[in-house]
Amino acid sequence: MSESKLAEQFLDAAIGLLQRVRDEDAEPIAAAGTLIADTVADGGRLFAFGAGHSSLAAQDLVYRAGGLALMNLLAVPGVVGVDVMPATLGSALERVDGLASAVLDSSPVRSGDVLVIISLSGRNALPVEMSMNARALGVKVIGVTSVAYASQTRSRHVSGTYLKDHCDIVLDSRIAVGDAELTLDTIEAPFAPASTVVTTALLQAVMATAAGTLADRGIEPPLLRSGNVDGGHDWNDRVMREYGDRIFYRR
């Protein structure tokens, strides 16, 4: 099979997943956008967390041109990405019981805030405990996961539960277990993951909804502009001064 044919198949698969998310997740997307708008309007703060490659979608929300300035990354050292050596350390830390409690205790997250937790499988201790503990603090949790994992894998948390079981709102990415969209007779393993594409788009749909909801209420959404357009830095400086008490990535 030609390389171009495989490229087309992957793009078709990704487009198909995006269409499913658009059609089947419309209700939770609207609910999540409304929750974020409510939180912004009520003086709450916004946080996003993801481990490993799930962190990419979280990072895409933070200090982002066209995004809400109030979204902060809840970072866990060694877990955020593949910048640690060995890269497998992050996967091991995701399975450590009690880590989420230590992270939340040392973070500015408090009652009335929103925490977006992204975990494709939703089966490891860190995202499960992060959601459980955050809700116990009075934090609203939006979980982004593939619900299919709950029926096709075993939870790695002592409770036997998954991220989806401890969220106020669940966004289902519809990614198949294994996160690989293509197979080929001449290649032993499935390949071409689409979770980052879909999860990132899903969350940007939520943020767009939040911005529109705020505008409908007569509230200017605290959006950032690109620093690479004229006037962008001045605009961002104004927004950050106005909302500085809710922005933690400048401290």
Swiss-Prot record:
InterPro entries: RpiR-like_SIS, SIS_dom, SIS_dom_sf, SIS_GmhA/DiaA_subfam, UPF0309. Residues 36-220 form the SIS domain. One of its GO terms (biological process) is carbohydrate derivative metabolic process. CDD domains: SIS_RpiR. It comes from the Bacteria. GO terms for molecular function: carbohydrate derivative binding. It holds the Pfam family SIS_2. Belongs to the UPF0309 family. This is UPF0309 protein SAV_3856.
